[in-house]
């Protein structure tokens, strides 16, 4: 199997086709608020299974030479379509899980629960990245000419199997969710008001919502797109061996496994959610400024800076996501989270393209040993600028919290 760079770019971009341009993520949020977590969660699981199954079929099947689908080679078009469907399921599953956590932990250890959920998700991502190549290699074959061919569909089949197990697990969860609803009724809890379409207007006219959404897109735009270029930065600026260059950026997601639940627990018990977001934004600015300045271009300094970024990357999400239910009523949470994710996806699509353009147009260095070098100073200042903007909105959010009494500085645990 051979896929050109252009085809691979089309395939990877497919994740956002339906979510961003067809507004499926927002529609999913509305369905979540109207139909509930059980219906929406099962639907999201089935979409993920369908999408992954389509990808597996596309990658494992040999199609007629010259056949096309959606204006692309059939294999690429079918795989991209599967990835787009999978992306809808993933994003809707994400907002569904967030609403489930609020349902179970509101007034309790909500930030800790969200932190543990984020840590578990990142652990899954790390494992997926770690086992893909070994599995493809293990199930590979050597042809008659002695050329080894890795089994590319094998990791996809494993993922499809894991998704099926996850779907069964969520189906089992639905029974526990029914029990929770029954126990709340027995305790005399007031039934939640039904979601109405006019609630969308109430969300988008809520200043606190937009402050959180803009803080989210600016902060994540300075982290995830940076990680796409971080390995090359380690090579170009800090002279790290290319085979080891990915080790330093990998410290960031590894650190969040432990720090995000830790800071979430702090928010639950002590409060200071807006302050945590401000501190995280300040650390983000500091880190990208250090990466931009021509000082201490050695590997150990880059490692220290990356660890500090990991702290900032844990501080903001641990406080930001649990703060949304303090600003938005629970009946509107699915739509609110969907809108935030939708805004975030625009940033995560646009910023990598911006950085790539800046590198190619303004940051090219000499060609060394046949390889193009780049000066990452300007991109790092751009990332620092996103951090400054995130800090501005974090400070604004803290001021708005004082006016509106959202309770962002108060503990989540109600005594």
Predicted regions mapped to residue ranges:
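C-terminal ends and interior cores of transmembrane alpha-helices
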Residues: 46-71, 282-296
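Symmetry-related core transmembrane helices of the 12-TM Major Facilitator Superfamily/SLC fold
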Residues: 153-173, 378-396
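Extracytoplasmic gate region of multi-pass secondary transporters
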Residues: 206-260, 351-352
């Amino acid at each position: 199997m051979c896929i050109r760079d252009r085809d691979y770019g089309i395939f990877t971009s497919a994740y956002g086709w339906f979510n961003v341009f067809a507004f499926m993520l927002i529609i999913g949020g509305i369905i979540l608020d109207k139909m509930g977590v059980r219906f929406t969660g099962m639907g999201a699981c089935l979409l993920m299974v369908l999408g992954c199954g389509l990808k597996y079929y596309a990658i494992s099947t040999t199609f007629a030479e010259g056949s096309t689908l959606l204006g692309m080679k059939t294999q690429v078009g079918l795989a991209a379509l599967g990835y787009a469907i999978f992306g809808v399921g993933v994003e809707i599953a994400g907002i569904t899980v967030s609403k489930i956590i609020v349902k179970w932990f509101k007034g309790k250890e909500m930030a800790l629960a969200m932190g543990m959920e984020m840590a578990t998700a990142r652990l899954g991502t790390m494992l997926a990245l770690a086992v893909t190549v070994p599995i493809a290699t293990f199930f590979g074959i050597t042809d008659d000419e002695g050329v080894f061919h890795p089994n590319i569909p094998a990791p996809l089949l494993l993922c499809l199997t894991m998704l099926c197990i996850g779907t069964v697990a969520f189906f089992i969860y639905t029974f526990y969710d029914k029990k929770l609803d029954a126990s709340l009724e027995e305790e005399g809890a007031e039934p939640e008001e039904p979601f109405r379409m006019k609630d969308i207007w109430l969300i988008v006219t809520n200043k606190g919502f937009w402050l959180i959404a803009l803080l989210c897109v600016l902060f994540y735009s300075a982290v995830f797109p940076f990680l796409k270029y971080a390995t090359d930065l380690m090579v170009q600026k800090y002279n790290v061996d290319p085979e080891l260059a990915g080790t330093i950026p990998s410290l960031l997601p590894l650190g969040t496994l432990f720090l995000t639940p830790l800071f979430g627990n702090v928010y639950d018990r002590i409060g200071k959610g807006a302050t945590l977001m401000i501190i995280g934004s300040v650390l983000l600015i500091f880190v990208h400024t250090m990466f931009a300045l021509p000082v201490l271009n050695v590997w150990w300094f880059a490692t220290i800076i990356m660890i500090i970024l990991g702290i900032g990357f844990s501080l903001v999400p641990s406080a930001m996501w649990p703060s949304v239910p303090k600003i938005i009523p629970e009946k509107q949470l699915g739509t609110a989270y969907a809108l935030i994710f939708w805004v975030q996806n625009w940033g995560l699509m646009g910023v990598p393209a911006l950085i790539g353009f800046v590198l190619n147009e303004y940051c090219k260095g000499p060609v060394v040993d046949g390889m193009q070098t780049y000066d990452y100073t300007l991109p790092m200042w751009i990332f620092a600028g996103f951090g400054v903007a995130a800090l501005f909105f974090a400070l604004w959010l803290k001021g708005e919290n004082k006016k509106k009494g959202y309770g962002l500085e108060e503990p989540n645990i109600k005594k």
